[in-house]
Curated annotation (Swiss-Prot):
The gene is tatA. This is Sec-independent protein translocase protein TatA. It comes from Desulforapulum autotrophicum (strain ATCC 43914 / DSM 3382 / VKM B-1955 / HRM2). The chain crosses the membrane at residues 1-21. GO terms for biological process: protein transport by the Tat complex. Residues 45-66 are annotated as: Disordered.
């Protein structure tokens, strides 16, 4: 169960998506969603690394100021 949705609800949603977009468009949509998730994860990871770099630089600056 995902977010309060059971298997019957997920099947109904999948059928509606198939009707709206058609079977031919589904691989393109899936690929686009996958790329979006990958880019989001990369941006999050980069932001965390940059945050860590800022903390390290601030600590070094504090040591130099003493």
């Amino acid at each position: 169960m995902i977010g309060g949705l059971g298997m019957p609800e997920l099947i109904i949603i999948l059928v509606i998506i198939l009707i709206i977009f058609g079977a031919g468009k589904l691989p393109e949509i899936g690929s686009g969603i996958g790329k979006g998730i990958k880019n989001f994860k990369k941006a999050t990871r980069d932001a965390e690394l940059n945050e860590g770099d800022k903390d390290d630089k601030e600590k070094e600056q504090e040591k130099l100021d003493k």
